[in-house]
């Protein structure tokens, strides 16, 4: 029986030029929809239409500045002309839907972008969907009313029937007061502070009365709890994250469906060409990537060198040396992700570069405009890069999906060192694996499942005991592991190629949205 799924997400990264995403959550949403289209599933998606995107990162005098991310949405999206309205703060707000149809291998998925930038609305209401993750509590709740309640209304106006409403994170939880049909919920937040909560006073003021009357809550409305209470199926995004979520929300059944990435999107051309030539059907069945074991080592090595050259051309100055070991680190710049951990002992880093005839590190990542600590970390990365003599550090300004593909494929090692317990899943290491790039990471999120020591990558701080100085222990471990890794890379080429193959055959073949979607089909949309 065909199942109609409507997938709601505050951000969706379907293509780099459609600027309705900020990072991992949006790209995961896009990858999920691509997998649905590849399998010809009846999926529809709903998000907001951010005319000013997230923001454009500009580096001036060693500091991050933000500019609007204006983009030509009117050329990229189709104006459906279909409208609905929702009450926000006592006012009727008009919403129009724009559409983008993503063509997959065996079907297409329609994505609807909700826009309040209409002449019928006041100037303040026009701005409600203008930019992603901006404004205070009031603006955030207004966006969530538009996404959840407005989105459910829009689907009715469009004549789209839905069996399952899938809420990708709690932002769309208010759809539970509007939409009929089964609800599915995926939480991505591993720490209590990350869950959206709104005061009773604000909720009573902002929400439409008929929807408000369906809510039963105390002094504040927790969107994660609202979604959990109204869903037939809920899940976290890795085994560990599901455990943490069950501890945070006792009394709720929370399953684990570990995230994945869309294999065809995240395999750079030298690797996708290699797979096309040797593995029939891998694009719709990436489990077949286990067959990479049968491809000649020299071809895998050649594909990596081509990716490295592409990355060099992609960098503004193009000075990346093909022969030198290169590390990549790119993600949102925020304190728990510790982008400056590798710089804790500059002398140690310099000596590694001396011993192995050079070291290159490529960085990328934006800090949220209101995250002063995150912005400070961007400045610190830039400052440290100037202090090093033997280590060449590159920073990619205004990091995007395009930059991400060049980086995960063009570096030799992917570095990820979040503080433990703060990473729900993480997906950049999965993208790296599709391009034969092993990961060095703290044991957290998906890496607890994906790391086979010395085979697919390495762990940082394995002997860490809670309560100890995490930064000190992890930085010491990081340098020790780099010594081991760089030694293999420079002196044991065959072993290194074996590790590259393992990344593809063991991790890329499993940590993909094809496998992930099949798990949702079996457990959530059944």
Predicted regions and their residues:
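Catalytic cores of carbohydrate-active enzymes across secretory and cytosolic contexts
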Residues: 1-526
């Amino acid at each position: 029986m065909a199942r109609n799924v409507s997938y709601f997400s505050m951000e969706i990264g379907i293509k780099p030029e459609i600027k309705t995403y900020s990072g991992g959550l949006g790209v995961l949403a896009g990858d999920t929809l691509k997998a649905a289209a590849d399998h010809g599933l009846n999926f529809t998606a709903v998000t907001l239409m951010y005319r000013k995107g997230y923001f454009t990162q500009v580096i001036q005098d060693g500091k991050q500045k933000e500019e609007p991310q204006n983009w030509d949405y009117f050329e990229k999206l189709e104006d459906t002309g279909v409208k609905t309205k929702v009450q926000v703060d006592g006012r009727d707000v008009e919403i129009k839907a724009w559409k983008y149809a993503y063509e997959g291998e065996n079907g297409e998925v329609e994505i609807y972008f909700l826009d309040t930038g209409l002449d019928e609305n006041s100037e303040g209401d026009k701005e409600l969907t203008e930019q992603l993750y901006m404004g205070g509590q009031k603006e955030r709740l207004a966006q969530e009313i538009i996404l959840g309640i407005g989105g459910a209304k829009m689907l009715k106006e469009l004549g789209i029937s839905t069996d399952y409403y899938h809420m990708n994170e709690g932002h769309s939880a208010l759809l539970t007061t509007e939409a009929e049909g089964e609800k599915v919920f995926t939480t991505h937040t591993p720490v209590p502070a990350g869950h959206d909560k709104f005061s009773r006073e604000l909720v009573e003021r902002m929400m439409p009365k008929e929807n408000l009357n369906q809510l039963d809550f105390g002094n504040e409305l927790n969107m994660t709890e609202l979604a959990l209470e109204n869903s037939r199926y809920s899940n976290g995004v890795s085994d560990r994250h599901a455990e943490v979520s069950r501890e945070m929300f006792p009394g709720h059944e929370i399953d684990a469906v570990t995230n994945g990435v869309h294999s065809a999107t995240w395999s750079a051309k030298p690797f996708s060409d290699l797979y096309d030539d040797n593995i029939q059907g891998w694009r719709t069945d990436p489990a077949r990537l286990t067959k990479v074991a049968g491809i000649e080592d020299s071809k895998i090595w050649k594909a990596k060198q081509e990716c490295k050259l592409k990355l060099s051309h992609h960098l503004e100055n193009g000075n990346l040396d093909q022969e030198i070991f290169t590390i990549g680190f790119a993600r949102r710049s925020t304190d728990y992700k510790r982008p400056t951990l590798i710089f804790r002992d500059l002398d140690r880093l310099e000596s590694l570069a001396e011993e192995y005839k050079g070291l290159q590190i490529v960085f990328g990542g934006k800090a949220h405009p209101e995250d002063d600590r995150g912005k400070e970390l961007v400045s610190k990365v830039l400052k440290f890069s100037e202090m090093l003599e033997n280590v060449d550090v590159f920073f990619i300004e205004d990091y995007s999906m395009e930059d991400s593909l060049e980086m995960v494929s063009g570096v030799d090692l992917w570095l990820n060192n979040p503080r433990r317990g703060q990473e729900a899943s993480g997906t950049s290491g999965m993208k790296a694996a599709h391009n034969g790039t092993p990961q060095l990471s703290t044991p957290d999120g998906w890496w607890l499942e994906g790391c086979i020591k010395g085979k697919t990558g390495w762990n940082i701080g394995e002997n860490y005991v809670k309560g100890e100085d995490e930064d000190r222990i992890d930085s010491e471990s990081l340098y020790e592991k780099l010594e081991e890794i760089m030694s293999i890379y420079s002196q044991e080429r065959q072993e290194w190629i074996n590790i590259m193959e393992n990344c593809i055959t063991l991790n890329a073949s499993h940590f993909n949205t094809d496998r992930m979607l099949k798990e949702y089909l079996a457990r959530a949309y059944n």
